[in-house]
Amino acid sequence: MKNSLFSILLFLLLLGFLTYADISFKNLCSGVIERCDDLEENFNFYTKEERFESAMEIFNLIENKGSIASIYINHIDYDVMLNEALKLTIYIENDDSSESEASLHLLKFSTEHLKDLQVPNIKNIF
């Protein structure tokens, strides 16, 4: 009886952590996508400092709220998001607008893709 209760408790803890991690990761992705959309729409209207500040917000968001994400998803996918956000800040700092826009779009697309992978369906299972 003791082993059964321990197993049930462990299962419920695992289920709770997975639910929390999934919600946390989806919120992170939504925040990154919103900030990328804002930066994409206003890229030509922002000054260099505003673009850099916005890119740093994206980078800091991924870095600060990504501790659960790095455990929950494949660590390589999280590293790709973080590295792309870092490249975005460097491209903006060096006034490379074409690479900045490409990096921004890639960050947004990969984040949307990772968020879509969290929805259970036949495509994601096989």
PLM regions with names:
Residues F25-N42:
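Alpha-helical transmembrane signal-anchor/signal-peptide segments
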Residues L39, F43-R51, I92-D95:
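Short helix-adjacent coil turns
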Residues L15-G16, L39, L88:
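Alpha-helical transmembrane segments of multipass membrane proteins
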Residues R51-Y91:
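Extracytoplasmic/periplasmic/luminal assembly and interaction segments
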Residues F17-N27, I68-I76:
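A ubiquitous short alpha-helical element
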Residues I76-N124:
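Structured, soluble extracytoplasmic/luminal domains of envelope-associated proteins
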Residues F6-Y20:
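Hydrophobic membrane-insertion alpha-helices, especially the h-region
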Residues M1-N3:
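Positively charged n-region of N-terminal signal peptides that target proteins for export
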